[in-house]
């Protein structure tokens, strides 16, 4: 009897982990032929092989190198592999990418930190009517006329912060700048003295998210645990590191909750006329909506949503922009001639200490430089992985419910089909009239595209130009010859270590 039970269990394992995923892969291979590359792995070792390769190579280290090499060799439309029984399909063809991005309601974004109390209710990961409501509430704050009013504040923060710039941790210094800009401009909190675990609040939020997201790459056991148990994985045989991270999350949420509660009390103590005329930053908008709710249970859920929205927007506005700036500084250090050309432009177009909104439009070379960095080393190199919520088709590609879908537009950014000398860094390509070949408007999409594109793209570019302009006015940027660099995945795709460049004051 026992032997038959064992046979049944082994048969089930064989079906789930081998026959089921392999059958789907073979069907796709038969349908698309050479346009579909497949790689069956029993425990989804593909990603871990990439990590191993990234660690063992030298200064060209990049977690995506293997995928870029495979794409350039085979020119496939889809790359299909598996994580246990789950199919993961990476879409490389821009026409299929376009369809997937336009039909976003057929997917749910996968939360890289896999934790219910941090990002799941924020704008980036919410879905359906909740997402539409959040996007509508917040969209006016990202319109260009509203952003222009923030230019003096961005200059002031940048100038005060770069005076204390640390070459020991350049990325952290940049996070301090971008995070304070977000806190003051979008949450109306007029202080940079909120500390937690010996770090500024904005830096601690970024550190927590990056460390939690990176946990999934620490070992195959960690990744498999998340895949099977989802958000409950943090409480199943937690390691010491996981316990420490969970405590930091609790401490951080407590501080954010206090900030939200203070704003609620301020509104409650204010008369209606004052509420109507108060500056409409994100926190005020969200709290105003909260105060319209009379049901206590719904109020508690909304309070938690405000905390998560705060964390989501604070992190998105802090880390991604800071990592982009860090990448720009690295390429400026690698290409000193380009650095000098752009510095000359900044000093010519922006002669005063502040860089104003009218001058920003004249910084053509700086804009082109940022575009080239985004083409080659975008912090959001691969958009957030999506899981299909229903069976559907992308053109003639059948996607089944539960499949993981990756939209790998970074492959097109470095393809000779669309860019001359695609593997070379050449910011001057963006000074030409038509830098992109065979463009369907979904080739170069550094901030994604479609209805769920990055709501903060204009803000990120505005910040990047002002902060880089201010740094170029005051500092010479060189590479740190004492470190070896690599391009890793934490939450974003980012340069490591955090002191790969050195800023020297211009005398």
Please annotate each region the language model reported.
Residues 2-119, 127-129, 133, 153-160, ...:
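N-terminal membrane-proximal hinge/A-helix region immediately C-terminal to the signal-anchor transmembrane segment
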Residues 320-337, 343-345, 458-473:
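Cytochrome P450 catalytic-core helices
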Residues 6, 71, 158, 347-349, ...:
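Cytochrome P450 proximal C-terminal region
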Residues 34-40, 151, 155, 200-212, ...:
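Cytochrome P450 I-helix active-site segment
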Residues 407-435:
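Conserved cytochrome P450 K-helix/beta-meander segment immediately N-terminal to the heme-binding cysteine loop
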Residues 143, 244-324, 363, 431:
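Conserved cytochrome P450 catalytic core segment spanning the I/J/K helices
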Residues 38-65, 87, 112-187, 200-265, ...:
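Cytochrome P450 catalytic-domain helical core, especially the substrate-recognition surface
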